[in-house]
Each structure stands twice: as structure tokens, then as C-alpha cells.
Amino acid sequence: MNRMHIRWVSRGVIILLVIITCGMLLACGANKKEESKETSESFDMKAATNVTDTYMKYLTKEDIENSKKFYSKDLLKSTVSEKNNNLKIFGYNLTDTSEVGKSGVFKLKVARADITKPFASLDEYSIKIVKEESEYKISETNNTVQKEAFIQGNQIRLRNKNNVNTNLIIDIASMPNYAFSKDDKTNIGKIQVPKTKFSLINFSYGGENLAIATEDKDSYIAIVKIDESLAVQSDKGEDDKGGGGGSKENQGDKAKEKPIGKEITSVDLLKDSKVEFMTFSPEEKNLTVQYTKPGIGHCLRVYKLEGGDLISFKFEEKYPLDKVDITFSSYDKETLNFDVVPKKSGDKTITDITGKWQLSLKDFKAKKM
């Protein structure tokens, strides 16, 4: 009886162990299935960031059709095709990212400029990315104007957000009278700065710097550092003078308006050239200028913000400008993307250099993509 009892007990223990083991295996399988489901449904911020960057690159290139491919089904239904052909995006900088539930919100500073007149806008652009089935799509966009710079008479003025009042940045009379061309390596011959008119302007992403170009037959490029506290100091000074005063005094005060342009850095003077646009790098360490010149065509120059010096990479020396045009494409965080385009299609002598290139903004070395 004892042996029989022991056998039954042993069998019971074995059966119990088998049941427990099976239960554990089933539980592990369910957990793995649940983990797999959670992984497939989780939100990948890196993938969403890539969508945001690619979308902005398409907008910069004005490739509207490809940019629409990133819209969600609902957003695609509400798109409006109208656009300002003169006001273009020349750069953007991702300033903030946040994951909210199963979505990502990306905030960018976007620099826009008019290519036909001196007007620039610095906007905060917000993009919401959601996962639609297995793809990451843009479900919502918002744009808030941070700053505008524009021409009024011979002045460049600044408007903050929706303020009615504006502040003087600089007037054309305050521009330097003479400057050196970066082509003059001896720095001997100063050239008269063109003061016929302002041609183009553009903001840095922080809004503290404004790239300015003036032109007649030559083009002058400068960077003005903006200090908005000067406007507050100016207003306080006027308040301290007390009330009263007639219209002549008011006109005199207006004429003495203190500019918020704190200092100006001469960047370059391009002989017989026209500036097509200017754009700051995302890190705000460099300024890229695209210009055109008779007999040369389109070309780029990249300057350091600190001091306005040319970088060591000279596009004019690296490429045969009698055969190719050099045009700006886009920025990555520490690189400049540009295109080398043949002037004559089918020119087989330059196939090794035409195409897409990338310039490092750290060591200023270029490579073909």
C-alpha cells in the first residue's frame, strides 16, 4: 500500500509540474505576443523626426507634390494650393521635440524671405506627427509669426509678432561708405558701398542677426546684430524728457529714433554681381550667399558669422564656372548640400563633378554624394 500510495503521489506531482510548465509557456508566449504588439504600435520619435526633416526639405525646394505625401488623410483633404511664389523658405532649425501619447510634436524656426524685395519673416512652425497604419504622417501644422523685417522709405524696420509699433533697425544712410571685396586679398583697394537701395534681407533663426544686401551694379553684403533692448532704452529716454512739445518737436524726436541695430559687420562686396538669396546655417555659425554674375552664372560663397571671413573652401576655385552653375540645395545640422549643374546638357567632360555635393561646415571639405 505504501508503494502504491507513493506511485500515485509521484504521478500527481509529475502531472502538476507538467500543468505548471505548460501554463508558464503559454504565459510567456502571450507576453511575447503582447510585447510584439506593443513594439509594433509604439511611436518611433526618430522616424517621426526624419519625416519632419524630409518634409521641410521638400518645402524649401518648393516641391509641393512630394511634401503632400507626408500628410495624413484628413490633412490632405484640407490643403490649399495657393502660395506666394515670391516668399520662399530659405532655412529652418529644429528647436524642440516632444512625444505626446502616440504622437510627436516638432517645433522649428523657419526663415522666409521675399526674392523680389527686402522682406523677411521669422516664424515658429509646429508640426504634429502621428502613426497612420504603419506610416508616419503629418496630422497638424501651425505657424506663428515671431518677427518681420521690411522696408519703409530708406529704412529697414522690425515688427515683433502682431505688434502695431515697429522699430528702426538701420537706414541706408547708416551703412558703411566703403568696404573691401573678399576678392582683394591684399585689402588695399576699398570700394564704395552701393547705397541705391536695399535688395534682400533674411533673419537668423534666433532673430538676433539680420543679413542685408544693397545693390546697384555691385552688391554689398553685411550682417546687422539686433539688440531690442535699445528700443526700450530709447522709449525710457523719451519718457524721462517729460510731456509737452509741438508737432516740430515730435518730428524731431522721430528723426532721432534710436536704431535697434547694434553693430554691423561688413561681409563682402561683389563686383558686377547680384545677390539671389542669403541663408544662415542651422548652428548660426555661417552665412551662405548665392549670387549671379555675367560670364560666371550662379555660384555660392560661405562666410563665417564671426568676423565675416570667407571659409577656406572657395567654390570659384574648385569648379569650372564656365561649364557649371553652383546652386544651394539645403542644410543638414553641420553640412551644406549643393548642386553642381552643367550649363550645357550632355557635356561629358564634366560628368565626374556634376550632381549633388555635400560640404562639411566643420572642416570645410566637400564630397560628391
Regions found by a protein language model. Give the residues of each.
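C-terminal motif of bacterial Sec signal peptides marking the signal peptidase cleavage site
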Residues: 24-27
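Surface loop/turn motifs at the tips and blade-to-blade linkers of beta-strand repeat domains
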Residues: 191-195, 266-273, 315-322
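Bacterial signal peptide processing site
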Residues: 29-32
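Short beta-strand edge/turn micro-motifs at domain boundaries
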Residues: 121-191, 257-262, 357-369
